[in-house]
């Protein structure tokens, strides 16, 4: 389902800094939720600024080092920047954020599609995805997959923020001028534009390590 858009709220003209309702992870993954950092997370929020957060929404964009300096809650951010879904004037909305999940295969996909940037600018739209999937029957091991489809440099940052410098992950080039091009051409799984990490009770590491 989608949220924060005219499709979900036809009367809304302001679609900046929105968040989904809390998603019950125990209904998608194991009965205990999803492993992340130092425990099992049971609730996830999807935020329009290119991230998901655990336990609480993260509505605003913070111009701080990420991962590391952004305040609570815990976050996974494919492409964290000051996004704005609000259409220009009366034009048709093309930006949207939506989710898909399967309780039988224990996976959740989030898509940020044609996202604009602050102050209703849509000249540099960004499209990317986050795919979370259960790797073991017990639910104690989860794949975190980033997929980048179309990006433009807007000063974005990305990674996995656990609030612990020893376990957090920073995507290649995060915060730099070539971040977008690196995400589209680099990979850690031999597929350009795709990065996969694994979360379990031992922390977070690159897939295959």
Where are these regions (language model features)?
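Extracytoplasmic Ser/Thr/Pro-rich, glycosylation-prone low-complexity segments
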Residues: 1-209
């Amino acid at each position: 389902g989608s949220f924060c858009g005219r499709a979900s709220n036809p009367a809304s003209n302001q679609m900046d800094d929105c968040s989904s309702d809390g998603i019950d992870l125990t209904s998608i993954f194991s009965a205990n939720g999803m492993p992340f950092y130092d425990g099992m997370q049971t609730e996830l929020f999807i935020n329009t600024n290119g991230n998901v957060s655990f336990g609480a929404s993260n509505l605003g964009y913070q111009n701080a080092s990420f991962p590391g300096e952004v305040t609570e809650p815990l976050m996974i951010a494919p492409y964290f920047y000051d996004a704005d879904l609000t259409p220009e004037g009366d034009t048709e909305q093309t930006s949207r954020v939506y989710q898909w999940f399967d309780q039988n295969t224990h996976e959740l996909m989030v898509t940020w599609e044609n996202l604009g940037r602050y102050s209703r600018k849509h000249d540099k739209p960004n499209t990317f995805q986050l795919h979370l999937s259960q790797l073991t029957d017990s639910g104690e091991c989860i794949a975190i997959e980033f997929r980048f489809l179309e990006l433009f440099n807007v000063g974005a940052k990305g990674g996995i923020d656990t609030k612990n410098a020893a376990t957090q992950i920073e995507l290649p080039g995060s915060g730099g001028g070539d971040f977008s091009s690196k995400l589209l051409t680099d990979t850690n799984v031999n597929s350009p534009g795709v990065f996969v990490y694994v979360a379990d009770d031992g922390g977070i590491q690159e897939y295959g390590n």
